[in-house]
Amino acid sequence: ILNNKQAITPETTELLGKTFSTSAEMWLNLDAKYQLRKIEKKLSEKKELTYVKAEFRKLMPVYEMNKKGWFVNDVSTVYGIKAERKRIFGDEEVVPENDSMNFCARQTKFDYDFTLRYCNVWYQFAKIFAEKESLPVFNKAGLETIAKNLCSYTLKKDGINKIISDLHSCGVGFFVLSHLQKTYLDGAAFTLGNNPFIVYTARYDRVDNFWFVLAHEISHILLHFDHLVKGCLDDMDSSAGSELEIQADAKASELLHTDEILALGTQYRHYFTLDRLRQISESLQIAAPVVLGILQHYKIIEWKKFSSLRESAKEKIDGEFIKG
């Protein structure tokens, strides 16, 4: 009975009553109270778990993140949820403010019930992954050289991994972290300690999109390093709404020779051929998929044309740089 391996029965209450000179009813009542407390405890624990789960789901898309493998604790338990909250926010009880951002965001698509919270969680995870990186001291001059030669990387056979390697060599972290639903993020730039980081979400998993996002985030680092302690999270579908974004767009366009591409492409607007596209690519020494992406972005070429030039960027990136 003491080890909870045998229940109290009417027969055992009679024996206990005789042994301790008490009534059998007293033992029956004690057992009834004990069983009731056990039920109440289970109900209380179930109620707590239901509440904790509900609050956790308000902050982030739990099912999606669990599927991605982002959690290290069992989020089906109260203990696991509290441990994850502490890992993400630094405090298991913290409730992030819904009306404030700990980062600069460029977005037009917006869901007031989810976007702020989910973007904040995504950013916290980006920093968690960044903390695991070991980088040399940031070399701004080295990054400026990379930026100056950005177009030449697009032409290299393994240009994507080459530029990632060169970024790391000059103290700039890079990794892929997929976006979360309702965040609409393409990329981000932020600093951790004295090192800048670039994160690519591969929301639009195309080679041209990779180079656009990379050029934009490199521009943020070169132009707005002091602002990146808060982080810049970018939805490239949206228009630049702040001075920082306008400046980063202008710098990225310069790095990718956007004006020159548009000048050459506009004259063929109504009769574009693959040969003409490649001529522009060769004359400006920038990969044809990037030229195509720029001309499609500015609606000079329809999206459905030259689909053979569209390739996955993520498939070209070494697995060590893909975090989740």
Regions inferred by a protein language model and the residue ranges of each:
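Active-site hotspot residues in diverse enzymes, especially metal/ion-binding acidic/histidine motifs
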Residues: 1-324
